[in-house]
Amino acid sequence: MSFAEKITGLLARPNQQDPVGPEQPWYLKYGSRLLGIVAAFFAILFGLWNVISILTLNVGCLVAGIIQMVAGFVVMLLEAPCCFVCIEKVNDIADKVDSKPMYFRAGLYCAMAVPPIFMCFGLASLFGSGLIFATGVIYGMMALGKKASAEDMRAAAQQSYAGNATPQTTNDRAGIVNNAQPFSFTGAVGTDSNV
């Protein structure tokens, strides 16, 4: 068993089916899950640090810390439901979110990560929520899908040039607008008070 198979076996859920959509590379699929778990852990940890800021009577950081901790718990619930075995419906919720398109999860993670950063800007909220935001960005990239092959892109480029009937110009002044007037420096405006 190779190292990659061991890692994918550790990060796979029990009874997990392959996604119906386009196949993602294994390192992106399981890397996003691993980043989500690490992001959730640090979001909870640094959210707790922001909650302790109530000692300095900073209510904005208290609320931001609570939101960041809730976001961390939600990400942990969706990425690693095995951490919440004491709650009955966790697997149902995780399966329901897994059945949604990837851009749903990307938008959810990015939307949950932004408010704590704006409410209490600091290293704790920036790092904790920033990792959740990075997880959302990776899920967004996975939602966009793979890039087309080089042959497909060449064929599409040739078709777009074939439809363009205008001749290509190589003149140095080809980008200049016709009948454009040069700038003129006429001096001071008539309403200038010379101050």
From Swiss-Prot:
Keywords: Calcium, Calcium channel, Calcium transport, Cell membrane, Cell projection, Cytoplasmic vesicle, Endocytosis, Endosome, Ion channel, Ion transport, Membrane, Synapse, Transmembrane, Transmembrane helix, Transport
Gene Ontology biological-process entries: photoreceptor cell differentiation; synaptic vesicle endocytosis
Subunit description: Homomultimer. Associates with the dally/ magu complex.
Main function: Transmembrane protein which mediates synaptic endocytosis, fitness-based cell culling, neuronal culling, morphogen gradient scaling, and calcium transport. Regulates synaptic endocytosis and hence couples exo- with endocytosis. Controls two major modes of synaptic vesicle (SV) endocytosis in the synaptic boutons of neuromuscular junctions (NMJs); Ca(2+) channel-independent Clathrin-mediated endocytosis (CME) in response to mild stimulation, and Ca(2+) channel-dependent activity-dependent bulk endocytosis (ADBE) in response to strong stimulation.
Residue ranges of the TM segments: 34-54, 66-88, 117-137
Family: Belongs to the calcium channel flower family.
Domain of life: Eukaryota
Membrane topology category: Multi-pass membrane protein
Annotated Gene Ontology cellular component terms: cell projection; endosome; presynaptic membrane; synaptic vesicle membrane
Modulation of this protein's activity: Channel activity is inhibited by La(3+), which reduces Ca(2+) influx and thus inhibits it's function in promoting activity-dependent bulk endocytosis (ADBE) in response to high stimuli.
Site feature location: Calcium ion selectivity: E79
Protein name stated in the entry: Calcium channel flower
GO MF annotations in UniProt: calcium channel activity
Species for this entry: Drosophila ananassae (Fruit fly)
Compartments (UniProt record): Cell membrane; Cytoplasmic vesicle, Secretory vesicle, Synaptic vesicle membrane; Presynaptic cell membrane; Endosome
InterPro entries documented for this protein: TVP18/Ca-channel_flower
Keyword Membrane: yes
